[in-house]
C-alpha cells in the first residue's frame, strides 16, 4: 500500500485511499530476496493500472448518492488456541455465551482455564461479535468483509477461467482440494446489484482467513484443532 499510494499521489496530486480486497489466498510472488524491491515494483504497477483506469472511466458522478448499512454477526470460537488465549479477544470485541448473553471479564478467564484443563464443550464455547457492512456510492457498491476472504468465494473460478495459464491446483500440493466439493454460484460479487462492485477485506475487523469449506483440512494431531 505504501508505494502504491505514494505513486498515485505523486502522479495525480490528490489523496490516495487504499482498501484491501480479497487477500485471503496468499497469492504473492515467490521472492527470496530480503528487501522491499517486490513491494515497490508491485505497488507502482498497480498504481499505474489504477491511474490508467481513470483515463476512461466506465462511470462517474459529480453528486453521488451515499448509503450505508451494517449487520452485526456472532461467530463461535472453536479454535483451541483462541480459547486458551480468550482474554486477548475481548479487546475490540464483545464476547457472548451460546445463549447470546454477554460474558464478563472474569468469566472469560475462567473459560480459558476450563478449556486448558478439560476442553470446552460446544455449548460452553463463547461467541465473538463482528460486523458485515455495505456502502453505496452512486453506481458503486462496497461489501465490507471482517477478515481475509479467499478470492474464489468472491468471484468463483473453480472451472479454471481465471488461472491465466497456470495449473488450477499445484501438482506438488500434498493436500490438494477436492474441486468436486467447491461451492456453486452465485458468488459474492454476483449478489452485489450495482454496475461497480467491490469487496473490501479487513473491514472494521480481522476474524482471520475466510476459507472455502471444501479447501479446509485440519490434521487431528494439530494443537489448533477445535
Segments and roles (model prediction):
Residues 1-226:
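Non-catalytic substrate/cofactor recognition surfaces at enzyme active-site rims
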Amino acid at each position: 500500500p505504501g508505494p502504491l499510494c505514494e505513486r498515485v499521489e505523486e502522479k495525480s496530486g490528490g489523496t490516495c485511499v487504499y482498501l484491501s480486497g480479497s487477500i485471503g489466498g496468499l497469492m504473492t510472488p515467490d521472492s527470496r530476496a530480503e528487501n522491499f524491491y517486490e513491494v515497490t515494483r508491485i505497488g507502482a504497477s498497480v498504481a499505474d493500472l489504477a491511474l490508467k483506469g481513470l483515463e476512461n472511466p466506465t462511470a462517474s458522478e459529480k453528486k453521488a448518492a451515499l448509503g450505508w448499512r451494517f449487520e452485526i454477526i456472532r461467530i463461535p470460537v472453536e479454535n483451541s488456541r483462541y480459547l486458551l488465549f480468550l482474554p486477548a479477544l475481548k479487546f475490540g470485541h464483545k464476547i457472548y455465551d451460546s445463549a447470546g448473553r454477554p460474558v464478563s471479564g472474569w468469566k472469560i478467564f475462567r473459560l480459558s482455564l476450563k478449556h486448558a484443563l478439560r476442553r470446552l464443550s460446544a455449548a460452553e464455547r463463547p461467541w465473538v461479535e463482528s460486523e458485515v457492512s455495505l456502502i453505496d456510492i452512486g453506481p458503486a457498491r462496497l461489501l465490507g468483509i471482517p477478515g481475509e476472504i479467499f478470492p474464489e468465494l468472491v468471484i468463483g473460478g473453480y472451472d479454471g477461467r481465471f488461472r491465466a495459464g497456470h495449473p488450477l491446483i499445484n501438482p506438488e500440493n500434498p493436500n490438494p482440494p477436492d474441486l468436486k466439493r467447491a461451492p456453486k454460484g452465485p458468488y459474492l460479487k454476483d449478489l452485489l446489484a450495482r454496475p461497480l462492485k467491490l469487496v473490501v477485506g479487513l473491514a472494521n475487523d480481522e476474524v482471520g482467513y475466510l476459507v472455502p469449506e471444501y479447501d479446509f483440512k485440519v490434521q487431528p494431531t494439530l494443537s489448533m484443532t477445535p
